[in-house]
Amino acid sequence: MGGDLPYRDLNSYLKGRFGERVQKITLDAGLTCPNRDGRIGTGGCLYCNARGSGTGAWDRGQSITAQMQMGIVRLARRYGAAKFIAYFQSFSNTYAPIAKLRKLYDEALAFPQAVGLSLGTRPDCLADDVLDLLAGYARDRLVWLELGLQSAHDATLQRINRGHDVACFTAAATRAAARGLEVVAHVILGLPGEGPQEMAATAAYLGRLPLHGAKIHLLYVVNESGLASLCQSGDYVCLTEDQYIQRVVDFIERLPAHLVIHRLTGDPHPEELVAPAWCLDKPRVLQRLRDEFDRRGTRQGSYFVK
């Protein structure tokens, strides 16, 4: 665990691995998603809008090189960091021809300060040639493959229009891990139709896979998404802050102790957020999570079952 925290936090893990603070630089490569370009669908996932959690940097004409340069300057000034992970976040960052992907990744890794690569993507966007490319990078640097699962329940995945099933994620995570890649599962708590039991079952599912880490995200509502329509009609109600605190602690208690927790809530763009307003106060949410672990006297792995 990191310091005296009740879970294995990312910052402590990175300091242990690299001997100093490491920061992620968020990159927008102007890519798309098979759930938007027509290969699987066109509307995207229920909670996603047309910006796909992106920064819009690519559309503003900023190359990967420019984004890296600006990120290094900004994060070095703010945190005193000298090492960075190139984090391709927007849309599906393994969904393009292999030559294009190699060029994008190489451009980010050309900076001597870049010690690793993190790619947000879908489990159905992992062709063998992409995995082989990433395995090559992983021989001498950190490579995280952040795979979107969201839920371990097929009924939920259908409800949110994911376009893949749980078996697809299982196969993708297993194939990636077999090549030596570090897989981070992205899950969302508060999805429509899910209660405490379903969320806890997703945690148990993660514990059976060859994962490096988990990224836990609150389901918040952004404008121009399908979820926004459901929220405005009253057909979806966000978790309260108290409910979210309980569900996250329940979740982490059921994860194996070795998994690195990459995220514990979300960081919505304030101008896009419809609800819930409480998620904008991230420091308070994180402190309340720690307080709840203290109240229960538990920590990550307390209720993990092999």
PLM features: what roles do these ranges have?
Residues 23-27, 84-86, 117-119, 143-147, ...:
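Hydrophobic faces of well-ordered beta-strands that scaffold small-molecule active sites
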Residues 1-12, 18-23, 213, 221-306:
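Auxiliary Fe-S-binding modules of radical SAM enzymes
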Residues 167-226, 242-265:
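Conserved C-terminal portion of the radical SAM core fold
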Residues 51-71, 75-98, 112-126, 142-169, ...:
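Core AdoMet radical
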Residues 1-85:
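N-terminal [4Fe-4S]-dependent radical SAM core
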Residues 75-77, 105-112, 132-142, 174-178, ...:
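Acidic (Asp/Glu)-rich catalytic clusters
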Residues 98-106, 127-136, 199:
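Distinct, well-ordered alpha-helical segments
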Residues 45, 107-114, 201-215, 285-299:
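Structural recognition of alpha->loop->beta junctions
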